[in-house]
């Protein structure tokens, strides 16, 4: 049986959405939920200063939490419309930042997207932003565990 897909979106698919994807998958596997996360970037061309496949801040937090990484760690990937159609749940990490990009590029999918308010590094320190993402990821996992236990 194919897992249900949650899709995390951010601008560059380098920091916030990647952390959310990896953290969600780690927790979902532990609880055998039948859900899997993936992530994509809405505008990879807007990202600047990226070194390597994933943010060092995301890596440090994942390491501190004992979350293993798939090897090799993939590089950021752009969003295409088919992913928005096939995902069962979609989360954009910051409404103020991502709503304009979605309106411009994928307006037909707006009604399916849940918006969070997690700022990028220019507005929030990594400890704050990544803690917000962790809390955001844990809540639906707990709901899914509760549902599957019934």
What are these regions (language model features)?
Residues 12-14, 95-98:
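Short glycine-rich anion-binding loops that position phosphate/pyrophosphate groups of nucleotides
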Residues 96-150:
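Phosphate-binding/catalytic loops
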Residues 78-83, 102-104:
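Short, flexible, glycine/charge-rich loop motifs used to bind or transfer phosphoryl groups or to couple energy/partner
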Residues 87:
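An anion/phosphate-binding loop that grips the pyrophosphate of nucleotide cofactors and donors
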Residues 1-81, 145-150:
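Conserved active-site segments centered on acidic
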């Amino acid at each position: 049986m194919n897992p249900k897909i949650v899709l995390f979106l951010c601008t560059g698919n380098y920091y916030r959405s990647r952390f959310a994807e990896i953290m969600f998958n780690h927790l979902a596997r532990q609880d055998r939920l039948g859900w899997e996360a993936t992530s994509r970037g809405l505008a990879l061309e807007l990202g600047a200063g990226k070194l390597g496949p994933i943010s060092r801040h995301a890596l440090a937090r994942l390491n501190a939490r004992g979350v293993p990484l798939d090897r090799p760690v993939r590089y950021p990937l752009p969003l295409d419309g088919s992913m928005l159609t096939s995902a069962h749940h979609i989360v954009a990490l910051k409404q103020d930042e991502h709503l304009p990009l979605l309106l411009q590029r994928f307006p037909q999918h707006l009604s399916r997207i849940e918006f969070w308010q997690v700022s990028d590094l220019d507005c929030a320190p990594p400890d704050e932003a990544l803690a917000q993402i962790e809390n955001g990821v844990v809540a639906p996992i707990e709901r899914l565990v509760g549902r599957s236990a019934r």
